[in-house]
């Protein structure tokens, strides 16, 4: 199976953990969209669930498929969240945020009893960091914040190019919360736990794309089917 087939296989396997009456968090990105589309087919066939999307993009897709939607203000407790990952390691530590929705994804995931990660085999790595780490920052004073990010990263053994994300027109990319994202190409992150905590102590940093101690399970698509990794 190619990578997209592996994503689909993982998404379909995740449906096994969805039960009638559940309140679900729905992730953002190409892998999560496979799950949302598969979930839409189940809803069309009569499955009774309600979903909380992690982005405007996911909300539009889910609505187009007839999936009933709610929000965390009205539904503050969720049963599971199913989302993709840009990278994951054997301890179920993740890098997320390639789709620009890391803050909402983390809020929704931590409002859930369980987070289930779905991914193709290429996303499973020994050491996080090959995928650039997204860090969400407020626009005010962002250049100062970026310098602080570089200093903190260096103190945790991470160096590399940092760049403010741009949209397809070359203009600054804004998240759904109207913040910037700096993508940090560290190559390797030797201490994900320490780096994540240190980054979030920087004034101006809203959050970062390291998900530590959040995922309960990963379903990884492979050439032969799917593998499950549990925390």
UniProtKB/Swiss-Prot annotation:
Record's keyword annotation contains Glycosyltransferase: no
Keyword annotations from UniProtKB, A to Z: Isomerase
GO molecular function, one term: ribose-5-phosphate isomerase activity
Kinase is among the record's keywords: no
EC number(s) recorded for this UniProt protein: 5.3.1.6
Subunit (UniProt): Homodimer.
HAMAP family for the chain: Rib_5P_isom_A (MF_00170)
Protein name, as recorded: Ribose-5-phosphate isomerase A
Gene name as annotated: rpiA
């Amino acid at each position: 199976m190619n990578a997209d087939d592996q994503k689909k296989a993982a998404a379909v396997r995740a449906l096994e953990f969805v039960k009638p009456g559940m309140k679900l968090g729905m992730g953002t990105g190409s892998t999560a969209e496979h799950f949302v589309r598969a979930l839409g087919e189940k809803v069309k066939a009569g499955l009774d669930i309600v979903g909380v999307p992690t982005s405007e993009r996911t909300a539009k897709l889910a609505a187009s498929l007839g999936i009933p939607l709610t929000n965390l203000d009205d539904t503050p407790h969720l049963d599971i969240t199913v989302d993709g990952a840009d990278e994951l390691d054997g301890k179920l530590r993740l890098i997320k945020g390639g789709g620009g929705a890391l803050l909402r994804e983390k809020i929704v995931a931590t409002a859930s009893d369980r987070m289930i990660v779905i991914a193709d085999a290429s996303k499973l790595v020994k050491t996080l960091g090959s995928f650039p780490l997204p860090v969400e920052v407020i626009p005010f004073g962002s250049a100062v914040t970026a310098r602080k990010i570089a200093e903190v990263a260096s103190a945790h053994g991470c160096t590399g190019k940092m760049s403010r994300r741009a949209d397809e027109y070359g203009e600054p990319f804004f998240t759904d919360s109207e913040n910037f994202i700096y993508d940090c190409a560290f190559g390797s992150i030797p201490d994900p736990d320490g780096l994540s905590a240190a980054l979030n102590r920087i004034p101006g940093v809203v959050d970062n794309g390291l998900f530590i101690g959040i995922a309960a399970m990963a379903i990884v698509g492979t050439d032969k089917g799917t593998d499950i990794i549990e925390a």
